Regions:
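Catalytic-domain carbohydrate-binding cleft regions of carbohydrate-active enzymes
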Residues: 158
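Short alpha-helical segments and helix-capping/turn motifs at coil-helix boundaries
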Residues: 34-40, 169-171
Length: 247
């Protein structure tokens, strides 16, 4: 990671000198998506933990060609002013794929007072859904692979799982009608990541890329028996180019 620790006197992170990218591009964790993004978390005040969707999503950082040539940073009107190479970042990625840290996602039971994880569940894709914690001791989360999972809040054990066949970003919600408790989830992916194409191995392919990004509202209750038919995978093969007949 780009910082070795946090200086508890100043509250500032202490930069890792081994990952300085002034002279040579470096893989940095976390990348610009952060170790946690906007996906909802859930707070358990009784247990003193936060159930947190987290991610390791690295990005290659290098200085712009202009800075390398002149040593001077100039502000760019009407564009991003990050001081790093943006236009050529795709080539930087291709040049450094062998050294890329593996992107991963996590569901963490995190103690915000100690900074210690009580438990961690690893997820094969980094861009997953928000979290719902219940008074019954369950933690629900949907993931990029399309699974809605209920975990034991004490140890992270998966107790129940349902394949929605669509990537999930939204958090589940719970409500009660006539004494019956329900859990609902809105499936569907969004953001630029969905349109970036197939992820590079070993990152798992998101369900919305495999089956199409068809959002659904699904509702569950104990004893519910409705089934969801498995869709056909989308054919994304490149068709054969037709013969050129122009002269």
């Amino acid at each position: 990671t780009w910082a070795t620790h946090v200086d508890m006197e100043t509250g500032r992170p202490v930069e890792n000198p081994d990952l300085n990218y002034l002279e040579k591009e470096q893989w940095i964790l976390p990348g610009p998506l952060g170790a946690h993004n906007w996906q909802a978390m859930s707070v358990d005040t009784a247990a003193g933990v936060v159930y947190l969707p987290a991610q390791d999503n690295p990005l290659i950082y290098g200085m712009s060609e202009e800075w390398k040539a002149s040593g001077v940073y100039k502000r760019n009107e009407g564009g991003w002013n990050l001081g790093i190479e943006i236009a050529g970042i795709a080539q930087l990625l291709l040049n450094n794929l062998e050294d890329q840290p593996t992107p991963k996602g996590y569901l963490k039971a995190f103690d915000p007072l100690t900074g210690i994880d009580k438990w961690v569940v690893e997820i094969p894709h980094y861009w997953n859904g928000g979290v719902l914690g219940t008074a019954g001791g369950l933690v629900f989360q949907g993931d990029a692979l399309g699974y809605l999972t209920a975990y034991n809040k004490d140890n992270g054990e998966a107790l129940w799982q349902f394949n929605t066949y669509t990537s999930i970003l939204a958090p589940p919600v719970s409500f009660m009608i006539d004494g019956i408790q329900y859990v609902s989830i809105l499936t569907g992916n969004g953001g630029g990541d969905l349109f970036a194409g197939e992820p590079l191995p070993p990152v798992a392919e998101p369900a919305s890329l495999t089956y199409g990004n068809y959002g659904k509202l699904l509702t569950f209750k104990i004893g519910g028996d409705a089934a969801l038919e498995a869709p056909t995978a989308v054919d994304r093969s490149i068709p054969e180019q037709p013969a050129l007949t122009a002269s």
